[in-house]
Amino acid sequence: MASGKEIRGKIKSVENTKKITKAMEMVAASKMRKAQERMHAARPYSDKIRNIAANLSQANPEYTHPFLVKSDVSKTVGFIIVTTDKGLCGGMNTNSLRIVTTKLRELEAQGKKVETVAIGNKGLGFLNRIGARVVSHAVQIGDTPHLDKLIGPVKVMLDAYQDGKLDAVYVVYTKFINTMKQEPMMEQLLPLAADALKADADSLAWDYIYEPDAQTVIDELLIRYVEALIFQSVAENLASEQSARMVAMKSASDNAGSVIGELKLVYNKTRQAAITKELSEIVAGAAAV
């Protein structure tokens, strides 16, 4: 059995760890609230752009933007994979990358090639380890994502799709459901879902006056719409990250408390055994005199 001094050292070590995890839990909780606010604030923007794009597409059926055209010529699929820059957020990244691995194997079995864009250090490291083709990446996004940091890597994928080098583009991220639940998602980014746009357009009974013309507006608008979808994915992923980290650190703090309780029990038993032994020796010595 370990000595009392060794057990006290272990208790002190676990208590120090608990202080760290508790502080990280509080920081994550604060960041989570801010991330949720940004996530909710971004939704009306992307929703409004989708409504206008839907109206434009329906009002000008003679023009079809490349983002709405399905293709199966290049036999190459693009992925924009959104992960975190840091760890200590439970199995969040693992769950997202697991569905990426499954999809990559499926496409490989179909004889298709894959090109990827990594947003976040964890995803970039994973893609490099498995030998995937990474055409661009963005890391160190920080707690406040900016479109300026994302637009470069995203544009690589958009240009490749417009040039016919990609048949489809998917985005992978972790969707924020609530504080305790986050789900890994894989959504088709391109070609845009024409049915969804049509459904939005059917609910609108008005039209705009477009300057200089509808085609120019829709060309620019659909690019902005796709960028908004990517930004929304990053915002959702960030909110999920802080929620997962808060839960993970709370679990770590609770586990540390349990370990401290068990160690204190062992320490008390050891101390009691030592006292009993000393008393026995004193009594035996007194009896021998």
UniProtKB/Swiss-Prot annotation:
Main subcellular location of this protein, as a coarse class: membrane
GO-annotated molecular function: ATP binding; proton-transporting ATP synthase activity, rotational mechanism
Alphabetically ordered keywords of this record: ATP synthesis, Cell inner membrane, Cell membrane, CF(1), Hydrogen ion transport, Ion transport, Membrane, Transport
GO biological process: proton motive force-driven plasma membrane ATP synthesis
Highest taxon of the lineage: Bacteria
Disulfide bond entries: none
Lineage: Bacteria, Pseudomonadati, Pseudomonadota, Betaproteobacteria, Burkholderiales
One Pfam match: ATP-synt
InterPro entries: ATP_synth_F1_ATPase_gsu, ATP_synth_F1_gsu, ATP_synth_F1_gsu_CS
Recorded family membership: Belongs to the ATPase gamma chain family.
Protein location: Cell inner membrane
SUPFAM superfamilies: ATP synthase (F1-ATPase), gamma subunit (SSF52943)
Any single Gene Ontology cellular-component annotation: proton-transporting ATP synthase complex
Subunit annotation: F-type ATPases have 2 components, CF(1) - the catalytic core - and CF(0) - the membrane proton channel. CF(1) has five subunits: alpha(3), beta(3), gamma(1), delta(1), epsilon(1). CF(0) has three main subunits: a, b and c.
UniProt topology in membrane: Peripheral membrane protein
PROSITE patterns hit by this protein: ATPASE_GAMMA
Described purpose of this protein according to its UniProt entry: Produces ATP from ADP in the presence of a proton gradient across the membrane. The gamma chain is believed to be important in regulating ATPase activity and the flow of protons through the CF(0) complex.
Protein name: ATP synthase gamma chain
